[in-house]
Each structure stands twice: as C-alpha cells, then as structure tokens.
Amino acid sequence: MCIRDRYKDTVANPTSANIEEAKDLYLAHGCQALLAFGGGSSMDCAKAVGARLARPNKPLAKMEGILKIWHKLPLLIAVPTTAGTGSETTLAAVITDADTHHKYAINDFNLIPDYAVLEPSVTYGLPPQLTATTGMDALTHAIEAYIGRSTTKQTRAASIEAIQLIFDNLQTAYKNGNNKTARRNMLRASYLAGTAFTKSYVGYVHAVAHSLGGCYGIPHGLANSVLLPIVLEAYGTAAHKKLARLARITGISDSKLDAVAAEEFINHIRSMNISMNIPETLDGIRNEDIPKLACYADKEANPLYPVPALWGPEKLEQMYHLVQEVSEHDRNRNSEHPGKAA
C-alpha cells in the first residue's frame, strides 16, 4: 500500500468541517482507500469521509440516523491507538456540526471497517488519563449494551467478557502503560464491547455525553466515565436485576439481593474512577444550556435506544445537573433564584 497523503487535523469531537477537508484531500490525491490510525475521533472522521465519498451529493447532516448511506465505502482499514470507542468494529460514526455544535450519530452497516488491526504496541504511549477515560468508555459500551432491552445471547456474552477484561486490566494499563498483556486485553475488550453495542445499542449515558461533547467539546470518554455511575443509579429498580447479574458474574458481589448487588456494582465503578483520578463532575456546563442539551439527548435516544427505563427531557435535565461543576457565576444566580437546581 502506498500512502498518498494524510489528514491530521481531526479534533477530539470530529466536525463536519474536518470531514469535508479530509474528503477534499482524498480526492485531490486520487486516493483509493482510507486508513484510520488513531482513537475514536480519527476512526469516526474516516468513516464519515467514506460516507461522503460514497454519497457525494448527500450532505452529512442528511445521513444522521439509521441506514441513510446505502452505498459501499472505499476500502477502510482501522488501527485503533486507544482501547475505548470500539469504532473499528461498529456501524456508527459520531460527528459534530461545525456551525450548530449539534453532535449526532450516523449508523449504517457500510460504516463497519473492512479490516481492524489490534496491535497493543501502538497503545503504549497513551497517557494514563486517556487510558483511563477511553477504557471507561469501553466499559460504558459493554454495560449499556447488556442492560438494554434489545440483547441477544451473543451480545450478552460479548458484554460480559468485555466487562471482566476491563475490570481485570484497565487499572494495570493505567499504572503501567507498557504492560503488553493489559494493553492487548483492553484492545480485545474494546472490540468486544463494540460488537455488542453495534447490535444492542447504548443508552442515556451516551445520549447525554454526546450532547456535552458537541456543545462544550468535552472528550467523549471523560463524559461517559463521569456519567456512567450516575445514570446507572438513576435507572433504579429498572436496571437492578441485570446489574446484579453482572456484579455476581464478575465477582463484585455475592449478595442474593438484586438491589444490594447492583449498588455494589455501581460503587465498584465509582471506585475505579477514583483510583484513576477521574473527576465526579464536569466543568463548564451552563444552566441556560441544559434544556436544549436535554432535548438533543432525548432526540438521540428515543425511540432508538432500548434503555431500561424511558425518560423524557425533564428527567434528562437532572443528569446534567448531577454532573455539573457549579461555577461561581451559576452559584450566585442560583442563590438569587433558589427554585433552579445546580
């Protein structure tokens, strides 16, 4: 393979402008294939470029949703350098509109890469904090795929294996980035979680995280890491049975009471976050943005995501407040208007 040129300006949440620039570069150099080398952002960018090449007369925004491409992409090879998004095996690409900052997903089987290369050595240089948040992203994929209402025997098995691998290897990879076994196992976990949620989808953790990434540029893995225990707890009894089953399978709990085992499972996730210096809140979320963000999340999740419990925008607004790191400005405003939660 002769690499004609490379596009290296992809941002953490790839924008429609990134896709158009990379597409123009592909055409200018007469390229015949796409090689996505990097994390989820690079792979999503490459997928979206392929979609634009396959459907040159269809704007990217018109591809939002399910099965809007219907054309084969150029050859696409994915080489993940993070163990998190699982984009090397999924049918999704998540893009942010450069003008409106609306973050949306394109879902089409043609977006699944033709080849995925899982090579642990390319992840050795990943900083500890990115190792942590991308790993928790993979955990979110696996858990949301498992607790949803559209699972299969295969997706449940893939989710369980991914969760166990992450519990056993993520903190090792965080502490020692050159541990080949931990890095290899995390790549496998990410891949398995990707195969699971491609068929069983995700849930409200992702819907809220996508809106935060689009509006504020918050890295997707970080948003998922912070939101995961909060959203799981908010599901309440609707998720207890499946979370309890995961707790027992992974050895987190031996309680026969589903509520207790589920709580211990969620607390284990919190402990993992703490051990890897992942914060409990997210900075920069503005109160005035929350209703709009909740509507974005609601539009993304409903009715596509088979979540354990169905929420509307008002319930989703609570999730933003729960992860919000209150600024001095908002603290003053809330003291003047005590009816508004922070």
Q: Predicted segment positions?
A:
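Short, small-residue-biased leader/transition segments that mark boundaries at the very start
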Residues: 1-3
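Carboxylate- and glycine-rich phosphate/diphosphate-binding segment that chelates Mg2+/Mn2+
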Residues: 92-200
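C-terminal charged capping/lid subdomain of soluble metabolic enzymes
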Residues: 243, 253-342
